[in-house]
Amino acid sequence: MIVDIDQAVPLPLAAGYDICIAGGGVAGIVLAYTLAGRGKRILLLEAGGYEFSENSQSLYSGANIGREYFDLDVTRLRYLGGTSNHWGGACRPLDVHDFKRHDHIDESGWPIGITDIQPYLSEAHEIMEISDFPAERALNGSGGRLREISFRISRPPVRFGEKYREFLASSDAVDVFLSANLIDIDLDPDSGRVSAFTFRGYGEGGPIYKAYADRYVIALGGIENARTLLNANRQVPQGLGNDHDLVGRYFMEHLHHTLGYHFTDSTKTRFGETARFVSPTVEMMRREQIANAAFAIGGIYSFDDWSFPANVMLRSRAVLCANEAVKDFVERMIGPLRCRPDRSGSLSVFSEQIPNRNSRIRLSDENDRFGLRRPVLDWQLLPMDKKTIRTGALEIAKYFARNDIGRMKILDWVLDENDPLPPGIDKGEQVGGNHHMGTTRMGASRQDGVVDRDCRMFGVENLYVAGSSVFCTVGHAHPTLTIVQLALRLRDHLAPA
């Protein structure tokens, strides 16, 4: 059943549920769908509707006070399906290395290993509608310092609100309330357990509802999970789960940048026939004291690889640009030509950000329409973040030279050791992947994490957090596939088969 609470009178709210989930994005929908299959009675609270609306989206506005970043009401979406509604579809699991503790990276390591989520990979592939990943190998000629890696693309990208809408609408096991804004979390003063999620619609002076369940899950996204817990300070002044000042800290993103361009004598090489993405090996990361990263080597092709009309366009531009007189004549007739006669393609990076306690979500002094303080993002990087990018780019340039593939032009800002950070949005860079991670990190104890290995909040035995906010380290892989794996693992914890 799906009901918009601003239109339903009276609201068909059951007296109690097995599990109440706040957030109808990837994690929330996967949990609702799979828990229903285990016989659980589920309430799913989604603050938006079926489609984008300014009424809902405006509640995502906030401030950036650290490194320049996307506007907070642009980098995420607030309607059924969540940010999957503008997801690009890229998928890759985290590496074994990403879960481990590394001496050169402070506060690295998870309290779980890849073997704890590996059993859910095939089921996650089915949900994401992607095929299995091929075996990966060291890159020939790299001296064991680089490896070839692969990604899968969900095509078209799965829009979770659309994919599961029919099931959610017809299911007797799941109640979905749209326009249901979570505004408070009630605690039982004796047990410390969550006793209710308090929510309301958009109508001025409209009713306030309480959802009762045995267990509760917050699945609102990497920014909103932290903001919600920090705002839940009516009974716990410092915010729920924030006994050790960890909620909102360790905000991490993936650094996305163009690093340079490569030039080859031939537009097709033995390298271009195989690798498109490379990453440093574990040995290189340890030796160079860097984090994980994926480097995309784009634009290596031959004209024979392109079908008409792309083939003709590429050939024609190459001919026109080769002769300055012809180029001048054509430009007078049709306008400027984009000539890059000897440039084969670009080098770009999707790089891991290492954990940084001072990179965080705070609360603003400004309140939203429901009286909740808005988020403030203070995104901070560390020197190793730049070092990882610079070291990897130089290694790939050396690889091109050693193997007589061609030459590479690395941009000045990458090479400048005195420039500690990549350029920001004002210089035309994407800067990040719209991936919000780490703000309610998993820990072995409440001194180093907000949730335990089962995504249960320390000190609140019936409250769980789902999504990329529980990540301890982030690797370079896009987070959506791992979000689904962790949601399936949480499903098994909440409702063992």
Predicted regions and their residues:
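Redox-cofactor-proximal catalytic regions of oxidoreductases
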Residues: S61-A135, F271, F350, I354-D365, ...
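N-terminal Rossmann-like FAD-binding beta1-loop-alpha1 element of flavoenzymes
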Residues: Y17-L44
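A glycine-rich dinucleotide-binding beta-alpha-beta segment and adjacent secondary-structure elements
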Residues: D175-D190, D342-Q353, N358, P375-Q380, ...
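Mid-to-C-terminal "cap/lid" subdomains and adjacent gly/pro-rich loops that border
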Residues: Y33, R215, A219-L220, A226-G345, ...
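Residue-level detector of alpha-helix initiation sites
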Residues: G25-V26, I223, V470
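Extreme N-terminal leader/targeting segments of oxidoreductases
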Residues: M1-I19, G37-R38, L488, P496
